[in-house]
């Protein structure tokens, strides 16, 4: 697994007040860094690599709080901010182009895209069926304040910030990261998506046996 790389670079830029268009100018450089890091890992002898993409950041409490608006058209059917998710799609599209180039440059290695974006959207869209609280899907478990239980100046870890009673019923832990239960289910989706693409005989035979 190479990364995830770039998420904190974008987070920092957004928190410095840069616009989406300004942050988009960073994406080619970030993707090139990921590509070079992957090539370096290949140089160390790796033959099967997973390179993960970006989450749909417009679905996360931290961004829903920072960019909250009364404009209903800014949100999609899952109540995610469309412009921010489009930013993630832009990053992921460039990353998949870079992975295609890596495959051409290293035909003897298997390089697979880790689709964090669609894994999380699956989790969010099926959350009520998976045992999560449907009234708190975009509220932080560890947080305080606002519609998303996330305070821009009161973060998880502050003695004044409470924790929800049952984290296993929440997707978001602290507004930025997921709960262990959410990560577990997302990982299950990713494994099922990635394993067939890794071209590993043991994995194929094991998958067909379970």
Identify what each model region corresponds to:
Residues 1-25, 43, 47-66, 170:
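Oxyanion-hole/transition-state-stabilizing segment in secreted/luminal serine hydrolases
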Residues 23-29, 76-88:
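A short acidic, glycine-rich active-site loop
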Residues 56-82, 97, 101-104, 108-176, ...:
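Mobile gating loops/cap/lid regions near enzyme active sites that modulate substrate access
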Residues 179:
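Short, conserved phosphate/pyrophosphate- and ester-handling motifs at nucleotide-, phospho-/glycolipid
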Residues 36-48, 90-111:
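A structural motif corresponding to the C-terminal end of an alpha-helix
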Residues 189-197:
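C-terminal alpha-helix
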Residues 26, 30-37, 91, 95-98, ...:
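Stable alpha-helical elements in mature extracytoplasmic
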């Amino acid at each position: 697994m190479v990364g995830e790389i770039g998420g904190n670079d974008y987070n920092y830029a957004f928190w410095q007040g840069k616009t989406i268009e300004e942050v988009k100018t960073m994406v080619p450089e970030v993707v090139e860094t990921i590509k070079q890091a992957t090539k370096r890992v290949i140089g160390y002898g790796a033959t099967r690599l997973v390179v993960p993409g970006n989450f749909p950041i417009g679905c996360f409490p931290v961004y829903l709080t920072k960019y909250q608006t009364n404009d209903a058209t800014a949100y999609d059917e899952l109540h995610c901010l469309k412009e921010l998710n489009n930013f993630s799609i832009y990053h992921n599209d460039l990353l998949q182009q870079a992975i295609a180039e890596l495959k051409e440059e290293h035909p003897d290695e298997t390089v697979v895209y880790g689709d964090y974006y669609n894994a999380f959207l699956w989790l969010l869209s099926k959350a009520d069926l998976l045992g999560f609280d449907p009234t708190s899907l975009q509220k932080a478990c560890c947080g305080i304040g606002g519609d998303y239980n996330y305070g821009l100046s009161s973060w998880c870890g502050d003695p004044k910030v409470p924790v929800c009673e049952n984290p296993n019923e929440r997707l978001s832990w602290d507004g930025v990261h997921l709960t262990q239960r959410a990560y577990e289910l997302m990982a299950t989706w990713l494994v099922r998506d990635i394993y067939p693409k890794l071209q590993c005989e043991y994995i194929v035979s094991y998958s067909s046996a379970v």
